[in-house]
C-alpha cells in the first residue's frame, strides 16, 4: 500500500508539472519550447510551506481526499484553512486580527479598522504576514470607496476576501504574491486599477468576475500558465488583455461577455482555448485559428452569432 501511494503521488506530481507542456509531435502546437520539468519541480519545492507539510505531503493528502485538482491554491488552502493541526493560536494587533501557524507565519483573519486606504502589514508581532484570509469586507466596505495594498511578505489572497466589495477602487499587489484564490475579487465593480506582479503563478476561477470597470488587464509580467474558468468574465469595460508568454491554456468563460474586449495577444505557449473562453467579445477567432490553437469541438459564440471552427483533423 505504501508503494502504491508513492506511485500515485509521483503520477500526480507529473500530471501537475506537465499539464501545460505542449506535445512537440502535435501538428497544432506553436513554436513554444517545452517546459523544463526539472526546473518546475525545483520551483514547486521552493514554495514549501513547512517542513511538516511539503509538496509531497500535500500530494499524499490530496490523494487521500480524492482531490481532482492539484495546484498551489489547494496546497495553501489545505495547510492554512483545512487541516486544523497547523494553526497554533489567534491574536489581535492594532486594526488586524490574525492566526499564527507552526511555521511561524501569520495570516490576517479580520480587519477592524475604518480607513479608506488599507495597508496590510509586512509583519505582525514579529510574524511574517504570508496571507490574507477569508475576511468579510463585503459587510463593512460594500459601498465605501477604499484602496488596498498588500504587505511585502504576502504569498496568497484567499477566496472571497474582497468579493462583493463594491467600493474597492484600487489594489496594489506586492512582488512575492504567488496565488490569488478563486472568487477573491468577484463583483468588485468599482475596481479600476490593479497590478499583477511578476511572481504571480495562479489566479483561481472567477477571481475577477464582474469587475466591470477594469479597462486593461496587464498580465504580461506574471508566470501564469493558464487563465482559469470565469477568471475575468463580465469585465464589461476591459478593452485590452496582455497575456504572458507562459500561458498555454485559456479555460471556459475566461473572458466571457467582456463586450469591449478587442485586443488580446497570442502567447507562444498557447495551445488550447475553451469554446466559450472568448464568447461575447470582439476578438477575431481567425487570428487564433491561424496560429494553430485548438478550440476543441463545436462552435464558439462571439458577438451574438455563432462562428464555425474550421478544424483540421488531428
Residue ranges and their predicted role:
Residues 159-161, 181-184, 204-207, 228-231, ...:
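Consensus positions within tandem repeat domains that build extended binding/scaffold surfaces
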Residues 25-51, 55, 60-67, 71-72, ...:
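N-terminal, intrinsically disordered, polar/charged segments of Gram-positive cell-envelope systems
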Residues 1-6:
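Positively charged n-region of N-terminal signal peptides that target proteins for export
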Residues 49-52, 63-73, 95-97, 101-105, ...:
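Structural signature of tandem-repeat unit edges
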Residues 22:
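Short, conserved catalytic or interaction motifs in soluble domains
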Residues 78-89, 103-111, 308:
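Generic recognition of long tandem-repeat/solenoid scaffolds
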Residues 111, 135-140:
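Acidic, Ser/Thr
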Residues 18-19:
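C-terminal motif of bacterial Sec signal peptides marking the signal peptidase cleavage site
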Amino acid at each position: 500500500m505504501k508503494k502504491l501511494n508513492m506511485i500515485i503521488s509521483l503520477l500526480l506530481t507529473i500530471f501537475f508539472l506537465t499539464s501545460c507542456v505542449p506535445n512537440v509531435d502535435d501538428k497544432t502546437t506553436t513554436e513554444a519550447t517545452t517546459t523544463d520539468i526539472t526546473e518546475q519541480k525545483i520551483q514547486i519545492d521552493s514554495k514549501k510551506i513547512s517542513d511538516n507539510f511539503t509538496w509531497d505531503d500535500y500530494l499524499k493528502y490530496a490523494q487521500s481526499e480524492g482531490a481532482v485538482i492539484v495546484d498551489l491554491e489547494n496546497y495553501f488552502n489545505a495547510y492554512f484553512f483545512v487541516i486544523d493541526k497547523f494553526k497554533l493560536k489567534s491574536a489581535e494587533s492594532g486594526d488586524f486580527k490574525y492566526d499564527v501557524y507552526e511555521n511561524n507565519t501569520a495570516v490576517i483573519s479580520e480587519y477592524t479598522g475604518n480607513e479608506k486606504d488599507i495597508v496590510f502589514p509586512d509583519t505582525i508581532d514579529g510574524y511574517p504576514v504570508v496571507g490574507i484570509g477569508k475576511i468579510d469586507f463585503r459587510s463593512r466596505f460594500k459601498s465605501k470607496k477604499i484602496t488596498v495594498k498588500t504587505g511585502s511578505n504576502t504569498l496568497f489572497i484567499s477566496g472571497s476576501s474582497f468579493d462583493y466589495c463594491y467600493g474597492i477602487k484600487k489594489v496594489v499587489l506586492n512582488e512575492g504574491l504567488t496565488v490569488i484564490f478563486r472568487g477573491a475579487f468577484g463583483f468588485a465593480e468599482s475596481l479600476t486599477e490593479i497590478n499583477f506582479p511578476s511572481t504571480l503563478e495562479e489566479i483561481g476561477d472567477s477571481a475577477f468576475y464582474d469587475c466591470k470597470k477594469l479597462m486593461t488587464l496587464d498580465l504580461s509580467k506574471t508566470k501564469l500558465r493558464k487563465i482559469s474558468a470565469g477568471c475575468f468574465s463580465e469585465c464589461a469595460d476591459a478593452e485590452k488583455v496582455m497575456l504572458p508568454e507562459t500561458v498555454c491554456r485559456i479555460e471556459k468563460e475566461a473572458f466571457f461577455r467582456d463586450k469591449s474586449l478587442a485586443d488580446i495577444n497570442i502567447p507562444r505557449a498557447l495551445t488550447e482555448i475553451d469554446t466559450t473562453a472568448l464568447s461575447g467579445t470582439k476578438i477575431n477567432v481567425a487570428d487564433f485559428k491561424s496560429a494553430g490553437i485548438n478550440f476543441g469541438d463545436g462552435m464558439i459564440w462571439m458577438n451574438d452569432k455563432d462562428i464555425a471552427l474550421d478544424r483540421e483533423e488531428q
